[in-house]
């Protein structure tokens, strides 16, 4: 034998209220779209002439300028190129310059 106990939790009460609202609202078929008082009907899709006018205003994309910062890197932030790569590159440049100087002498 099972006994049903009503659930008294906020979610259950909210869903019961929503069910009540859904049962008491007017069905969508009865709402319908009717012309406004001024006689104009509702327009769902944009007017093609508005589209052409809008496109003429957008001849180019806006430019965004991002300037590099010289501040310290926060921990966990990734940077490119990595500092180790820059150090290795500087060492290679120094080695190549030294080799050229030795050949010239």
Swiss-Prot record:
Q: Where is the composition biased (Acidic residues)?
A: 86-96
**An example of a Gene Ontology BP annotation on this entry?**
negative regulation of stem cell differentiation
Q: Which UniProt keywords apply?
A: Cytoplasm, Developmental protein, Nucleus, Phosphoprotein, Transcription, Transcription regulation
Give every LBH domain span: 18-104
InterPro entries named among the record's database cross-references? LBH, LBH_dom, LBH_dom_prot
Broad class of where this protein is predominantly found: nucleus
Q: Where in the cell is it found?
A: Nucleus; Cytoplasm
Q: Where in this protein does the record put region Disordered? A: 86-105
Keyword match Cytoplasm: yes
Gene Ontology CC annotations of this record = cytoplasm; nucleus; protein-containing complex
In the record, Phosphoserine modifications are located at 63
Task: Provide the tissue specificity.
Answer: Highly expressed in heart, and expressed at low levels in placenta, lung, skeletal muscle, kidney and liver.
Q: In which family does this protein belong, per the annotation?
A: Belongs to the LBH family.
PANTHER family xref list: PROTEIN LBH, PROTEIN LBH-RELATED
Functional note: Transcriptional activator which may act in mitogen-activated protein kinase signaling pathway.
Query: What protein does this entry describe?
Result: Protein LBH
Taxonomy of the source species:
Eukaryota, Metazoa, Chordata, Craniata, Vertebrata
């Amino acid at each position: 034998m099972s006994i049903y106990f009503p659930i008294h939790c906020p979610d259950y009460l909210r869903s019961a209220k929503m069910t009540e609202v859904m049962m008491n609202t007017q069905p969508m078929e009865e709402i319908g779209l009717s012309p406004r008082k001024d006689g104009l009907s509702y327009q769902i899709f944009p007017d093609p002439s508005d589209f052409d006018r809008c496109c003429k205003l957008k001849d180019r994309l806006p430019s965004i300028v991002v300037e590099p910062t010289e501040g310290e890197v926060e921990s966990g932030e990734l940077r490119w190129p990595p500092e180790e790569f820059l150090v290795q590159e500087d060492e290679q440049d120094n080695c190549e310059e030294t080799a050229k100087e030795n050949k010239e002498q």
